[in-house]
């Protein structure tokens, strides 16, 4: 690598670090890290690590009954707190900063295997622009940044067909946040062909069973707080807010442009990009049924799923060749 390439790379990493600091310090301090939210965050942290619902239940605090099985980040923070004496809220803030920084770096590296540095940087710039939305409308969901890092690595490994690396990342991801249980579906849809579908089906089924076992095991071990949700009420609530706020609806602001560009780029996308679009749609449907969909923080994985096809759509608008017209890079070039 030339000296100029090192300089450009270093400056890009530095810029991503600055973005992370700005987001966490100047956006986060006025929202989820504010003094107003401090008591709620501390109470919910204690509830998770001790597996005891807070007073009034999870829903009364803007959480849900499955929060206590998203164990990796709260347990890590509790361990670091006991070992170092650093305040819990400061540790959460530090983890968010590191994870946002890592997410931007990994996102750029992933895209740069298929797209130019400028195109990859543009996608990262767009992601940075919508990051403030991920701080809004909630007080305590400390696993979403780390979950995004795990999703990025899993998507990268899935595209590169590195099954064992994908499996390792997926195992960690489901401990961070159980929505990663669907990742084997992307591995299969993105890679299976008429000649290889049996291989990828067996691999996806194997890791899927392991992830499901972990999920059910956590649910069984940490049971006692489950409350049956009315999913129809949740769907109606989400659509009512979606229609009522229109263009100002946070997911519309965050994902409207990538979705349009991904549709435009669908024809010139390769198999994995097309599978990622359908997979993103499936995730969106699940989230509309199960969560407060206006909270962009829980939908961040849609960006790396849509971005490659969206960049193909941008190329189409600019009259440049898409992914199917360019010489693809070898699938074994994954560098982590």
Report residues per predicted region.
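Perimembrane helix-loop-helix junctions
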Residues: 1, 182-209
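Short hydrophobic/aromatic helix or loop-helix immediately within or flanking a transmembrane segment
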Residues: 59-86, 179
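Transmembrane-helix motifs of polytopic, lipid-linked glycan transferases
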Residues: 91-115
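Specific aromatic-rich, kink-prone transmembrane helix
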Residues: 106, 146-165, 306-309
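Transmembrane-helix signature of polytopic, membrane-embedded enzymes
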Residues: 108-130, 149
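Membrane-interface alpha helices of multi-pass inner-membrane proteins
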Residues: 152-157, 164-177, 183-189
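Hydrophobic, aromatic-rich transmembrane alpha-helices
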Residues: 251-273, 283, 309
């Amino acid at each position: 690598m030339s000296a100029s390439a090192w300089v450009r790379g270093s400056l890009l990493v530095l810029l991503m670090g600055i973005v992370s600091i700005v987001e966490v310090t100047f956006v986060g301090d006025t929202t989820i890290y504010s003094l107003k939210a401090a008591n709620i965050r501390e109470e919910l942290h204690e509830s998770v690590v001790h597996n005891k619902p807070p007073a009034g239940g999870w829903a009364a605090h803007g959480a849900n009954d499955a929060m206590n099985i998203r164990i990796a980040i709260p347990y890590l923070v509790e361990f670091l707190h006991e070992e170092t004496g650093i305040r819990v809220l400061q540790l959460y803030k530090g983890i968010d900063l590191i994870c946002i920084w890592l997410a931007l770096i990994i996102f750029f590296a992933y895209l740069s295997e298929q797209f130019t540095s400028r195109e990859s940087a543009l996608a990262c710039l767009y992601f940075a622009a919508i990051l403030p939305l991920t701080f809004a409308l909630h007080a305590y969901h400390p696993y979403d940044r780390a979950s995004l890092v795990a999703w990025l690595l899993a998507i990268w490994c899935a595209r590169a067909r590195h099954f064992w690396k994908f499996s390792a990342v997926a195992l960690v991801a489901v401990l961070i946040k159980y929505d990663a249980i669907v990742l084997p579906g992307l591995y299969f849809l993105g890679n299976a062909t008429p000649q290889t579908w049996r291989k990828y089906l067996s691999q996806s089924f194997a890791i899927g069973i392991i992830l499901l076992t972990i999920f059910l095991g956590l649910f069984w071990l940490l049971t006692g707080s489950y409350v049956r949700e009315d999913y129809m009420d949740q769907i109606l609530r989400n659509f009512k807010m979606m229609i009522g706020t229109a263009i100002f609806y946070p997911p519309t602001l965050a994902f409207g442009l990538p979705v349009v560009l991904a549709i435009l780029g669908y024809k010139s996308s390769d198999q994995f990009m097309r599978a990622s679009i359908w997979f993103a749609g499936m995730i969106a449907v699940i989230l509309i049924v199960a969560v407060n969909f206006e909270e962009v923080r829980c939908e961040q994985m849609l960006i790396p799923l849509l971005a490659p096809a969206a960049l193909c759509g941008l190329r189409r608008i600019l009259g440049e060749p898409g992914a199917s017209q360019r010489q693809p890079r070898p699938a074994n070039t994954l560098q982590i």
